[in-house]
Amino acid sequence: MKRIAFVFSTTPHGTAAGREGLDALLATSALTDELAVFFIADGVFQLLPGQKPDTVLARDYIATFKLLGLYDIEQCWVCAASLRERGLDPQTSFVVEATPLEADALRRELANYDVILRF
């Protein structure tokens, strides 16, 4: 079975990319357990709790990330450099537990996957 990586690199609620990526991730988890989630660039904002998407008439899907554990999705990585560049502390309480990795280590980890889907 191929190993699949889901990379979230866009801000939440500006487009449907984050919501569609999360839907695809949860659906794929029913087919394989060889997957991981990566949050890079503006995708780190997907991890923040307390967002108010209703102010831009968007659906609040961020809380759904909390289901990753129920779906046995345990490999979650976040780019430490992306957090720093956006003024976010790696010790912040995110909606899902994600391990911070520096960019070079994150690239090495991502290289272990056969398929990379970016949202």
Swiss-Prot record:
Superkingdom of source: Bacteria
Keywords linked to the UniProt accession: Cytoplasm, tRNA processing
One family name in Pfam for this protein: DsrE
Residue pairs linked by disulfide bridges in the UniProt entry: none
GO biological process, one term: tRNA processing
Compartments where found: Cytoplasm
InterPro entries, A to Z: DsrEFH-like (IPR027396), Sulphur_relay_DsrE/F-like (IPR003787), Sulphur_relay_TusC (IPR037450), Sulphur_relay_TusC/DsrF (IPR017462)
Broad class of the protein's primary localization: cytoplasm
Gene Ontology CC annotation, any one: cytoplasm
UniProt keyword Zinc-finger present: no
Subunit details: Heterohexamer, formed by a dimer of trimers. The hexameric TusBCD complex contains 2 copies each of TusB, TusC and TusD. The TusBCD complex interacts with TusE.
PANTHER family (UniProt xref): PROTEIN TUSC
Function: Part of a sulfur-relay system required for 2-thiolation of 5-methylaminomethyl-2-thiouridine (mnm(5)s(2)U) at tRNA wobble positions.
Family: Belongs to the DsrF/TusC family.
Protein name: Protein TusC
